Amino acid sequence: MKNSIVKFSLTALAAFTLAACGSSGGSSDNTAAPSNEQKTQMTPSKTNQPTPNSTEANQNQTFTGSAFVISEQDDKVQVKNVKFNDANINQLEVDGKKITLTHPGIYSGSWQRIKDRINNTDVCCGSKYQNVRMGVSLSNGPTEDDILFYKGIPTQNMPVTGLASYKGDSIILSDDISDDSDEEAVEGQSSFDVNFGAKTLSGSITANNAPTINISANISGNSFEGTAKSTKLTDGAVEGKFYGNNAVELGGLAKANDNSWGAGFVGKKQ
């Protein structure tokens, strides 16, 4: 994985500029800035005060996840921010190209490498998560796209009160992960605390030899957006969603404002 990610981190993250895109499995905006999800306004019940077990039903934006899609033509890198609209966690479809995310009969609880004639896809983390997938799909040639993604089955019944903690997995990609010049990407952990009443999320992404990335976000519907900061890496932005019944899992992406690093993460409610 380390060697195959070099093309992604050295060419894509170093020149991370968002462009318009299309996907047979999703949609995109047409600006050069990161796309903003359409947010559903959440209105508390006027007749009853919510109890600790209350949920908000149907608070799902139409997209089910997103990806950074990196292509290179004539030494020029282009990056597209794709939104997925389907909830098939076994497959991605980008620009008509289908990418397998699971193998039948394989129930690994850790990172899984899936190869085909076009891509090498590293997916987290098999049977460990029931409602979301996150990973990196790397092309076998310079004319194909590289993809950093998360996708799942969005929560339909978001909690409106209470606290929850999530722990899970992450991947950080950067030219400056550590003193080891050959190490361009590392797999690690994620940890988040959520206040559903205040609609806030905070936490961190960590990985061996990589600086900790601290996450702070606001929740709208079943999605969240916010900032990603580190004492050793440049500041960035984060996006993500809650997945499964009663927000049992979450997933998302983050990247630096100066495009020097990118990250994906997933987590499970404890």
Regions picked out by a protein language model, each given a short descriptive name:
Residues M1-S9:
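Bacterial N-terminal signal peptides that target proteins for export
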Residues S9-L10, A228:
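Generic detector of short alpha-helix boundary/capping microenvironments
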Residues T17-A20:
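C-terminal motif of bacterial Sec signal peptides marking the signal peptidase cleavage site
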Residues G22-Q270:
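Mature soluble binding/inhibitory domains
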